[in-house]
Amino acid sequence: MENLRTPFSLISNALLARTEGLGFNATCRVYNITTRSLRSWEKRFGKLKGLLMTYALTHSFIKQVVEGDELYTKVRSNVPQEDSQGWTILLIERASRFIWALDCGKKDEELFMKAIKRLSEVIQSTSDLSLFTDGERRYGNKLFQLCHESLKTGKPGRPKKVLKKDIKVRVKNKGSQSHKPGRKRPKYQAPQSEHPLTKQDISDHNINANHAEAFNASLRRRNSAYRRKTNTYAKLTEALQRTLDVYWVVHNFIRQHYTTKRVPAENLGIIEKGLSFFDLLNRVR
């Protein structure tokens, strides 16, 4: 935040208001600042995401349970959902509530691969990782493309491809298929073959994305672009991603979660104590 003459207190208050649900123009009116200044502060603060993510990935984790889900909003105009640029992918660690991925764009392979590539980096530093998704099979399929290995058993023929050891993926199949003829899908399913030495210690009642759903509801309250009762949701995809980057930093490193009473990065063991806006704006170099 070098070369800025604005007091840190004003910048932090404005950014905090943005992450508590105040709209962009409303924040400018309340704090008597220009739209150019607020946009610049959000861009600069959001750039800390890359630095903090790199720092988080340098740590080693014994076990993680990650939930995946999607969130939808409109961008610029009202278009069919499949054409919207406002789809947001979330990957959140269940126990600590640490967000590993929070990216928006069109719901296509590029957006999914961006989130799964980040998850593959997390896998490299985690001894045992479980991924739960609520009805979206592409998470497991894309992860299989990046994190698979050939299972050599000594038998003739091509080795079978399986997920790497200690990686578990479960999908909760949505909807009832009792009215459809043919073979019925199981309620809980592994979309791809897993390593035979992977410990299968997942019970059925743990296969859910409830924490991700709760976060989605919270994000609709704390990010004005996701509210359902507004006429215009977000002007540009880049602007929507800018607000998500700011929210990612505040959620993971500044704001205490109301259930754990600790900052998610502190709860996951990345930092010893939660940070403040002053710490991030003044001391990170």
State the predicted function of each range.
Residues 77, 139-146:
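A short acidic (Asp/Glu
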Residues 80-87:
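Short, flexible loop/turn motifs enriched in small residues
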Residues 102-125, 130:
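Active-site beta-loop-alpha junctions of metal-dependent nucleic acid enzymes
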Residues 127-141, 173:
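Acidic/histidine-rich, metal-coordinating catalytic segments
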